[in-house]
Amino acid sequence: MQVEYLDLISQAKEIAETQFKAEPFSFDAIWKEVVKHFKISKQDEPNLISRFYQDFLEDPNFVYLGERNWKLRDFMKFDEWNKISQAMFVTKEIFEEGYEDLSNKKKENEEEVNDFIMGNDGDDNSTGDEIVQGLINDFRDDNQ
């Protein structure tokens, strides 16, 4: 059966609008309805489902709510959608009481790693640039 993937996604959106409306639904539920609508055979299902799932994930009309539930974005209030998108993409840092110092520890660890990479072990005053320049000079001396 020759089915266009865009047709599957657009039909999935129509099915969600008419059958599920503002109610959450599972991927399995929407897939079963798409299979029924297009009369997709059991033989063709494995060939279509992976691409459909990928397109489904990429389509901004479908929003993952967690616990295997999805919802159409058109039926969501802005605050509900905004809360989910912020949780998914961590648009702002969230601190809980007693954990404020974790960000400072992270910065200290990053500085230690940078010092290690640049060759600064804290025992001397050489900068990374000075160390690199010294290595270049040593290499030149060895090859002359």
From Swiss-Prot:
Source taxon at top rank: Bacteria
GO biological process: DNA-templated transcription; regulation of DNA-templated transcription
Gene Ontology terms: cellular component: DNA-directed RNA polymerase complex
Stretches assigned to the HTH HARE-type domain: 6-75
InterPro entries per record: Asxl_HARE-HTH, RNAP_delta_N_dom_sf, RpoE
Gene3D superfamilies, A to Z: RNA polymerase, subunit delta, N-terminal domain (1.10.10.1250)
Keyword set includes Zinc: no
Entry keyword Transferase: yes
Keywords: DNA-directed RNA polymerase, Nucleotidyltransferase, Transcription, Transferase
PROSITE patterns given in the database record: HTH_HARE (PS51913)
Gene Ontology molecular function: DNA-directed RNA polymerase activity
Entry function: Participates in both the initiation and recycling phases of transcription. In the presence of the delta subunit, RNAP displays an increased specificity of transcription, a decreased affinity for nucleic acids, and an increased efficiency of RNA synthesis because of enhanced recycling.
Quaternary structure, from the entry: RNAP is composed of a core of 2 alpha, a beta and a beta' subunits. The core is associated with a delta subunit and one of several sigma factors.
Family: Belongs to the RpoE family.
Protein name: Probable DNA-directed RNA polymerase subunit delta
Gene responsible for this protein: rpoE
